[in-house]
Amino acid sequence: MLINFNDRHAITVSGMNNCPGKAICEGDLVLFTMKKTIYLLVLVLSMGIFTGCGKENTEIENSRMEQQTTPENSENDEIHLDDELKIDFTCDYSEDIKKDVDDIVSHSTSLQEELTNMEKVTQKYTSLAEAAQTQGEMNVAAHWLYTIWDTELNNLWSRLSSSADRQTKENLLAEQRNWIDLKEEVTLLNIGSREENGSMYPLLQDSYLEEITKNRAYVLARELAKIKGEDFAMPEVSAKYGTFVDNQGTGDIYSSLITRQNWEGKDEAVISVYRQGEIEGSFVDNGNGELSFTSEDGSVKGMIKIDGWNGASFKITEAYGESPFSAGEEVEFPLAF
């Protein structure tokens, strides 16, 4: 499938079952939706939210954040959150979560320790996910797990804005506003629309938002650590899977790169380049963040390079036929989600 972009909002498609003037033919749309729905089912079933494993789950490798270990002798072992969680899917836990986050912040001796200790809050509210029996209850549990990291993100931002000098604050504010504007579009790219996913949509949406909000919290914590003169190490991230965008310094996505496992467990990439087109294909992991990409129709080959928190790039090595891409062309995706 090859999609040609005339501009950022007007899309025409060529090579799809002779359906001129349509973005996607009906048959292709049904197949695409079915494939995506099955993939998302595998994604959710792989998460601890269904299995009772909590958020310390056996993640499929789509997640950018690798599992972290807590230092054996860390003082965070002394932190105990107040009150065991009472399971009530009609309860508003907003204030409870805020109090728990505040407790973590006040009892942590460094930002590094604070971010590690946040897992204690997640563990506390994972009992909601473990007790969930219906789709509605699963949706509620996912919302509160996302709220934990959203609360921590807001807490970090409050401290950043009061500590940074004027120029730093202005730069960070612009970046944060762009991230907020981008996250809805990035979520749509990764999980699809509400119409595609039906009653599962809130679960998929909040689970994905939890993941990228946690990642963003680490970014803000790193910036705050710089201001405070603290050492801060970013966690390991996948050298194969992730979502990367080029937003041209705005709140809109111009180009994007998504690398992931599909519902069959095969490695795939979706690459969208501003004013040129979108291609889908498979990749082979060469190690060290280098992925050899081949489009579905074989017309485009290239090398994806993933640089962790610093983004990714795609260099085209071969292009054939009517491909809008040219050999030697390279696209940067500097923002990692």
Features from the language model and the residues they span:
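N-terminal, intrinsically disordered, polar/charged segments of Gram-positive cell-envelope systems
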Residues: K55-T126, P235-V245
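Long, amphipathic, charge-rich alpha-helical segments that form helical bundles/coiled-coils
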Residues: K169-Y208
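Contiguous, well-ordered beta-strand patches that form the walls/edges
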Residues: E170, D181, L188-L189, I271-S313
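Tryptophan-anchored aromatic micro-motifs
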Residues: D231-Y254, P334-A336
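Edge beta-strand at a domain terminus
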Residues: G277-E280, D285-G287, E318-F337
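Positively charged n-region of N-terminal signal peptides that target proteins for export
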Residues: V30-I38
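C-terminal motif of bacterial Sec signal peptides marking the signal peptidase cleavage site
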Residues: I49-G52
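N-terminal glycine/threonine-rich, aromatic-flanked beta-hairpin/loop signature
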Residues: T250-N286
